[in-house]
């Protein structure tokens, strides 16, 4: 799962590098200024797909294959509905939201164009995430990876064709991503239709079963809300960064690529925690629940810490892949040294939240994130940044909010563990 997320980010980095090297800093800033918005919408359907993953895993762990299959078909119908709604809303609010975020005027038209094309692809990306969640629930993480490699390769090739050959600039990159997302969704649907047993998908079985919809939403809505609130706070932070000028926006775009590598590595272990915990909890194997969470934390810390260290050490060289502007590279290294250095703390939040969802307590981490992450970040921007108007003062909010939130979620997990797993 971590490999899948990292490869996905690798292809995203190719998008950014193509724009940065062949279209310039303004195009790079345009792509980067939209990131919190696209992430906001992605977290909506990822949250719902987490709900599907938990419910399907629980049925499979309890050996209720008939119910698992019904939940799968319900989840796929939900993915189509969710994807359509996200795409339509995104098209409507793209420009107003970018204007509200104080996007620099010199990059605003490019940012609007890029975002609107991306929202077309959100429909396919939603379906892909649900399909991937279904296969993960059955313990299959390889085939989503293979499909991603195929679609990602198509994405990279089309990037070069659209940007270098046809001079489509940011629209070319967004169009390439949309085509790649559609490819991956179609490939995974074909795989599921060829499955045997509980995971087999058939068009004539596609319908919403309200009993499973309710269970998916009970888990999925809190996960979606948690992700949305994180990203709303990130939109406020991006607005603060936008006010500092196009070079800093471009530099943040470069640095965020490396943050996303570590974050997707983290979410791989968080998804593992959700799947293993929910399966073993469904099978009433409480000892293995605890062991799974411990291993996810240990391996997550090892890999996240190692990758973060490499990014910090080689940050000037790595940032230079995305842009040849020395001023942008220098600023990007500042963000990497402050934010990436503390991703291990963020790892604790994600894995512990995943464990709580797998144990059937999705609201706990959501409430704690609202109180200790989102509210703190908003207060920081409106109080601290308003007085100390520098790039560094914006960035410090990340490790501070992570540390406070992680402490509260660990305490919550220990309380739930004592009640549910120690018997």
Regions found by a protein language model. Name each.
Residues 28-88, 125-144, 251-315, 346-369:
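Small-residue-rich hydrophobic transmembrane alpha-helices
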Residues 56-121, 154, 165-221, 277-342, ...:
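Short alpha-helical transmembrane segments in multi-pass integral membrane proteins
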Residues 1, 5, 17, 54, ...:
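Transmembrane alpha-helix boundary and packing residues in multipass membrane permease domains
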Residues 49, 117-136, 144-152, 173-186, ...:
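Short runs within selected transmembrane alpha-helices of multi-pass transporters and secretion channels
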Residues 2-54, 118-125, 214-279, 300-308, ...:
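Transmembrane helix-bundle signature of multi-pass secondary active exporters and lipid flippases
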Residues 10-13, 22-25, 59-62, 137-138, ...:
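Helix-loop interface residues and adjacent transmembrane-helix termini in multi-pass membrane transporters
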Residues 375-385:
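Transmembrane alpha-helical segments of integral membrane proteins
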